[in-house]
Every structure is written in structure tokens, then in C-alpha cells.
Amino acid sequence: MQITKPALLVSSLLIACAATDTAAQEKPRTQPAYNYANVSFADYDGGDALTIAGGVEFNSPYFVSGHYKTIDSNAISASRDSVGFNLGRYFWLNSGLIADVQARVGRVDFGPLDSNYWGAEANLRQRVDQFEFYGGVGYLNYTDAGSDNIYQFGVNYFLNQNTSVGVGYQDSEYGDGVRLRASYHF
């Protein structure tokens, strides 16, 4: 997998922020973390992926998020890129339990075939001390490649108020995979 200069820059910034925040040892965050920047690495059936993502809450409880993903694909012997944007709303359900719904649009490069996509996603997040457990379902419709149902779950561990690391699992009709993530929350 080829790592691009923007990926290295964002990764370096996240590591620097994580080191600064770890030294501060602040109290864990207890509110939802929709303001974030993260980098993740995933091992999927069809290859490996590096993702740079971020989100901003712009008018509570609404948020926008986006990602750039590069996938080194074994299935098509090529690299694939994906760019996507989400617009969502979250709902406080109970102490530490939050639901969110999101509309998604984007574009993915399937090697020789490019396709736009649209879809929806719904997630539940439960905060317990420094752990945040999540699970969700999603649907994507690719204009040139059919549709996909997505199921995911995982856990994030907050090292301090602004830094978390996590592991997640995602299953879809195009394959499944495990994702490792480091996030900075602001």
C-alpha cells in the first residue's frame, strides 16, 4: 500500500496531539465526540485500507463528517480511492446512550470503474467510563455497482479527554474487515 503525503501529514499531527494530550492526563470526555480527526487502518477481505476522516458538530445536535480512503486491493490488483461526506443528527437516549442517523454521499474508484454512491447509516453509542461501545447498520447504493448492506461494531478507549484509540469490525456484501483507529477529539 502506498502512503500519500497528506496521510503522513495528518498521521504526524494526530501523533503529536496524542503525545501532548497524554502528558496532560485530563479527565475522560463524557459527551459525544462528533468533533474529531482520525486516521485508521483496516484489513479487509479484498485488501488493506488507510482512511483519514474528520467531523464537526455545526449546530447541536447536527454534524457533518467526511473521509478519504485509499484501498490496496488484492481482488483487482490495483489501488482504489474513496471520498465521502455525511450529514447527520444525534439523539440523547439515556445516560451515555446516543443514537445517530446520517445521510451519505460520495465517490469510489473500483479500479477501471468509478461510481458515485448515496446511502444512510444509523448507529448506537454507549459511553461507560473511558470506553465507548458502538454498533450500527448502513445501506449504500452505488450508481454503477449495485448496493451494499453494512453492519459494524467496535469499541473506542479514551486515553484522556481528547485522544482515543479503537478497534472495530465491519461486514458488508463486498467483504468484512477489522479496523484500528486513533482519534483526536476537539
Predicted ranges, named:
Residues 36-42, 55, 65-69, 100-106, ...:
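Transmembrane beta-strands of outer-membrane beta-barrel proteins
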Residues 56-58, 89-91, 105, 124-126, ...:
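Residue-level signature of outer-membrane beta-barrel architecture
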